[in-house]
Amino acid sequence: MSEWLMLLLGTALVNNVVLVKFLGLCPFMGVSKKVDSAIGMGMATTFVLTLASALTWLIEHFLLVPFDFGYLRILSFILVIAATVQFVEMVIKKTAPDLYKVLGIYLPLITTNCAVLGVALLNAGEGAGFVRSVLYGFGSALGFTMVMVLFAGLRERLALTSVPAAFSGAPISFITAGLLSLAFMGFAGLTNH
C-alpha cells in the first residue's frame, strides 16, 4: 500500500509532468488564467489521462506486443486518446455547458496534449503492470492538475498587482512558472521514483 502511495506522490510532486518533464505546457499556460477553468481542465485531463493509461496498457499488452505491432504504438495510442477525449467532451457538454464554454478550444486539444501521450508512452516503455500504469497516469494527472491550479491562483493574484510593463503578460507568467518549478524541486528527495 505504501508503495502505491509513494508512486502517487512521486509522480505528482517529484516527477511532475509539467515542471520536470515539460509535458502539457500548452494547456498549462493557456487555461491557467482563472482558477475555475484550471480546475475544470484539470479534472477533464485527470479523467482522460487515467482512462487513457488503462486503455493504452491493455492495447499494448493484448494487441501490440503479442502480434508484434509495436510500430503502431503511437498511432494506436493517439486514436485511443482521441476517442477518450471525444467521450469526455460529450459528457461535459451535456452535464456542464458553462464549463464546456470556458474550456473552449482547450478541451479538444487534450487529444494533442503531449502529457497524455507522453505518460502512455512512458508506461509502455517501463513495462509496468496494469495497476502501476494506471496509478502512474492518475498521479501524473493529479500533479498536472495541482500545478495548473496553483499557477492559475498565482496568475489571478498577479493580475491584481502592478507589474512593470516589460514583465506584463507572458514574461511574468514564465517567471512565475520557473519559481513554481523551483519550489517543486524541494520535493526531490521525497521518493526514489
From Swiss-Prot:
Chief place of localization: membrane
Swiss-Prot/TrEMBL keywords: Cell inner membrane, Cell membrane, Electron transport, Membrane, Translocase, Transmembrane, Transmembrane helix, Transport
TM spans (from-to): 5-25, 39-59, 62-82, 102-122, 134-154, 170-190
Annotated EC: 7.-.-.-
Protein's cellular compartments: Cell inner membrane
Keyword Membrane: yes
Keyword NADP: no
One of the GO biological process terms: electron transport chain
HAMAP family: RsxA_RnfA
Function statement: Part of a membrane-bound complex that couples electron transfer with translocation of ions across the membrane.
Family classification: Belongs to the NqrDE/RnfAE family.
Record's subunit section: The complex is composed of six subunits: RnfA, RnfB, RnfC, RnfD, RnfE and RnfG.
Alphabetized NCBIfam families for the sequence: PRK05151.1, rnfA
Annotated protein name in UniProt: Ion-translocating oxidoreductase complex subunit A
